[in-house]
Amino acid sequence: NMDSMVNHYSVTKHRRHTDAYTPGGEEGHRPNRAVTVYGNLIRQTFKDAPIIIGGIEASLRRLAHYDYWQDKLKRSVLLDSGADILIYGMGEHAIVEIADALDAGLPVDQITYINGTVYRTGSLDEVYDYDLLPSWDDLAADKLNYARSFNVQQQNMDPITGHRLVEPYPNSVYVVQNPPSATLTTDEMDEVAELPYARDWHPDYDAAGGVPAFAEIKFSISSNRGCFGECSFCALTFHQGRVLQMRSHDSIMREAELLTRDPEFKGYINDVGGPTANFS
């Protein structure tokens, strides 16, 4: 789960020469702003297909945002990608609820009630209990409005107290962010972590030497998620929320035992932790 622009460029905006997330470490196999590019290509090819976007790239661009690479304000990626629904945060609850709704035959434009999602609408007549953010025009006109908007967003990252947020755009377009999805319980964290993952790259990548980034995490264990720090240099709270969610000790030990069975295991586990590990 890697932002395509961070993947491609250094902090000084120089193009990276390698890509650790691509087979063989070769650069240039995915486009800049991949969510937007792929979303529009899918829409052109499958005009009526429901398009659901998520992950770090979509999550951090769910509302109007400052684009460091172009040094300009950009609209919600939901609008630019042509997607129907954006899942923000980690998404386990939301993606299951969306799948259930689609399986039940509900049109995608009626799936507007799921926490942890963002959708667009042309009217606020059926949108209730929301906080109105500064409009796109107001954001573009004054940087202070952008700061005020982001502050409201930061204050509504809690799944218990978070409000629904509405960001108006020209031509009666509204981007609606539902309240954050409920955090995972310890049992749910354990269940997600202990699914029968392949724990390897696809065999098709063997000829290229595999995926370099995998070596860094193959013998690591994620024990928790969420961060209450809100550090100005880090977007983690804005993606995972500020509530700490932890796996059980038994679950971590079961994964550790599983790692020892790998033929490449050399006797040590690189890391056990996650964001704010010292606070959990």
Regions found by a protein language model. Name each.
Residues 1-170, 177:
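Glycine-rich beta-alpha loop elements in corrinoid/cobalamin-binding modules
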Residues 90, 183-187, 247, 255:
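Short coil/turn linker and secondary-structure boundary residues
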Residues 105, 183-186, 263-266:
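Low-complexity, intrinsically disordered regions enriched in charged/polar residues
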Residues 144-220:
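N-terminal [4Fe-4S]-dependent radical SAM core
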